[in-house]
UniProtKB/Swiss-Prot annotation:
Mn(2+) 2 binds at residues 15, 75, 97, 149. This is Probable manganese-dependent inorganic pyrophosphatase. Pfam families: DHH (PF01368), DHHA2 (PF02833). It comes from Staphylococcus haemolyticus (strain JCSC1435). It catalyses: diphosphate + H2O = 2 phosphate + H(+).
Amino acid sequence: MAKTYIFGHQNPDTDAIASAIIMADFEQLTGNSEATPYRLGDINPETKFALDHFEVKAPELLSDNLDGREVILVDHNEFQQSAETISDAEIKHVVDHHRIANFETASPLWYRAEPVGCTATILYKMYKERGFEIKPHIAGLMISAIISDSLLFKSPTCTDEDVNAAKDLKDLANVDLDEYGLEMLKAGASTTDKSAEELLDMDAKSFNMGDYVTRIAQVNTVDIDEVLNRKEDLEKAMLETSANEKYDLFVLVVTDIINSDSKILVVGAEKDKVGEAFKVQLDDGMAFLSGVVSRKKQVVPQITDALIK
C-alpha cells in the first residue's frame, strides 16, 4: 500500500498539526496502515505545549515531492496555503472548515467541509459516526485544536458543536477545559523572544481576493502594545516580504486573547481599503478593532468585499 501524506496548511497552527495527526489515526482505523501525518512548517509554542502535555510526537516536516502521491488535506484547501507541489498530487480527501477557493482536482474525491469553528470538531464527528474508539491523546489533541481555533470558545466562529465536542472529550483527555485552555493559549502568546520576521510568519496565510493577493498574519498575545511597540521593525519586514512575494496588501492582526479585541497594522498600496472594510480610519497604518478575534470570519470576508467592490 502506498503512503498517504496527511497535512494542514503552511505556518501550521494547533488545528493544522492536531488534525493531521488525528486524521492519520482515523485513516489507520479504516485500514490505511500507510497514513502518515506531516507538517508544512515549524511547531509553534502553543502547539508544542499541547503535544508535550499529551505526550504526542510532532509530525515530520514534509520535504518529499508530491507528484503522483496520495494526499489528504486537513484544515485548508487553497493551493497557495498548501505544499509547493500540491498541484501535482492526487488529492483523495479534504476535511476543512474554511472557504473553498483556488482549489481543483483532476479526479473525484471525498470532501467534507462544515461551518464549524475547528477541523478537529469535524473529525470528532467522523469518529462518532464510524463508532471508532477515541484514544485519550487523540481526545486531548481534539480539545487543544478546538480551544486554539475558538480562543477558548470566545471566537464568533465557535459553534455549539465545537463546545459540545470539547465537553464530551474532557473526561477522556483528563483536563479541565478552562484551566488547560488558558495555560495553552498563554504558552503561545509570548512574543518577546521572537524577531519581527518570526512574529509575521507564526500564523500567516495568503488569500486571492479578486485581482489582489493579500497576506494576513495573526499574533495572539496578552499585551498588544508589547507587539506593536516594534512597529518600525514589523513594517519593514512586512514591506520586504510584500516586495519579495508580490503581495498587494499585508495585514497584521494582533489579538488580545484576554479581552477579545485586536489592533491591525497594514502596509500596501490598497491599505485604505482595509480602513473602509472595518469602517475605521487608519492612523499611521494602524487601527483598533473592538471585538475582532477571528481572521476567518471577521477579517478575510470584510477585506475581500472591500477589495472587489
